[in-house]
Amino acid sequence: MIKFSNISKEYHVGTQFVKALNQVNFEIEPHQLTVILGPSGSGKSTLLNILGGMGRPTKGDISFNDQQVNKLNDHDLTSYRRKVVGFVFQFYNLIPSLTALENVAIAAQLNNNDDLSENYLKSVGLEERMNNFPNQLSGGEMQRVSIARALAKKPKLLLCDEPTGALDSTTSMKILGILQNIANTTDTAVVMVTHNPEFERYGNRIIRLKDGEIESINDNEQPLLVGETG
C-alpha cells in the first residue's frame, strides 16, 4: 500500500515560493486502478513525481508498505525506483534502432527476467509485432510497447502520466483496457494521471486535484470495464 500523509511541495521561483501541493492525503491499494484528474497546473505531475521517487516532498511522509520513502537516502531512493516503480509516459521514449522485443528486453535484462520479454508483449496484444521497429508501429502500438517495457520491471506501482494524451479516442480506450486489466489481474497498483474526465468511470479510486489540493476522493465499488456501456 502507498500512503501520502500531509504531503506538501514548494518550489522556489525567483524570490517567491510556489506551492505545487498542499497537505495532500490519500492511499493507493494494489489490484486497483487509481485515476488522478485535474486541470493543468493542479499538481498532478508533481504528485506523480513524488510517488515515483523522482522528487521529494517539502513536508509530509510517503510510505510504501510501511517503508518511509521520503526518508530514503539517494542510493536507496534509486533502488526504490528501479525495483518498485514502472513508468509510462505520454511520449513513448522507445529506442528507434531496436525492435519492440529488444526495447522490452533491455528493461527485462536489468531485472533478470529477459526470458519473459515475449510474454510481456503478448500481454499487451503485440505478439505479431515483436520484430517491428518503432517507425513501423502506430502510436497505440508504441504505447503498448512502453507498457510492456514497464511491466518487465515487475513493478508494484505502475505510474502512467497522460498515457493516452497523444492518441485518438478508440486507441485510448484500448490502452485504458490494458491498464485496467493489469490492475485487475496482478499485484500491481496502477495510477493514471489524465485530463480526460470520461476515464473516472473506469477507475477504482478517483482523486481530483485543484490548485495543489485534494478536491475530492471517490471510490467506485463497481467501475465500468472497458467494452461495457453504462
Locations of the language-model features?
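Conserved beta-strand-loop-alpha-helix hinge in the C-terminal portion
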Residues: 205, 213-230
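ABC family nucleotide-binding domain
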Residues: 2-208
